[in-house]
Design a protein with these regions (language model features):
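Single conserved hydrophobic/aromatic residue that forms the stacking wall/gate
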Residues: 1-5, 9-10
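Structured alpha-helical segments in the cores of large, soluble enzyme domains
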Residues: 6-7, 33-48, 76
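Gly-rich Lys/Arg/Thr-decorated short loops/hinges at beta-loop-alpha junctions or inter-strand turns
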Residues: 11-26
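Structural preference for beta-strand elements that scaffold enzyme active sites
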Residues: 13-17, 52-54, 82-86
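Active-site-proximal loop/turn and secondary-structure-junction residues that shape catalytic pockets
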Residues: 20-22, 59-61, 89-93
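Conserved, mostly hydrophobic/aromatic
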Residues: 55, 111
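Short glycine/threonine-rich loop-to-helix capping motif typified by GTGT followed
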Residues: 63-73, 95-100
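Substrate-binding cleft of secreted/luminal carbohydrate-active enzymes
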Residues: 75-95
Length: 126
């Protein structure tokens, strides 16, 4: 955990974000599963760090497939150790080259209506 021993981290004001990672061979690996979240919670507690854990539903946790964010968000919200989620969302779905208004130029995103629908579904699960 890069937070442990960090001078930049004020112990009660920082939190961890589990985004997944690339292994030594460059393969994207998720870390939003129950075992990974539990292990991270243990590390935070052991080091007397803020226990708030945010789960990134995109990036390596989705294998860079923005449509998997929905499944990841639903799974995250059901985990009692998860304090929050992070979504890649924009006005228009996907990723666009050339500066199309309302569309991400970097990572592909859920569109506005998909995000709204997902947030309403997540609210119903709380």
């Amino acid at each position: 955990c890069s937070l442990v021993g960090s001078e930049m981290c004020i112990r009660d004001r920082c939190h961890g974000v589990l985004r997944g990672f690339s292994d030594s061979s460059g393969v994207m690996r998720p870390n939003n599963d129950g075992a990974s979240v539990g292990e991270f919670a243990r590390i935070l507690k052991e080091n007397k760090l803020n226990k708030f854990i945010m789960i990134d539903c995109s990036h390596a946790n989705s294998g860079k497939n923005y449509l998997r964010q929905t499944e990841n968000a639903i799974n995250a919200i059901k985990n009692p150790l998860c304090g929050g989620i992070m979504l890649e969302s924009y006005l228009k779905e996907g990723r666009c080259e050339g500066g199309v208004f309302g569309c991400s130029r970097t990572d592909a995103c859920l569109g506005w209506s998909q995000t709204e629908e997902l947030l309403l579904e997540l609210h119903g699960l709380l």
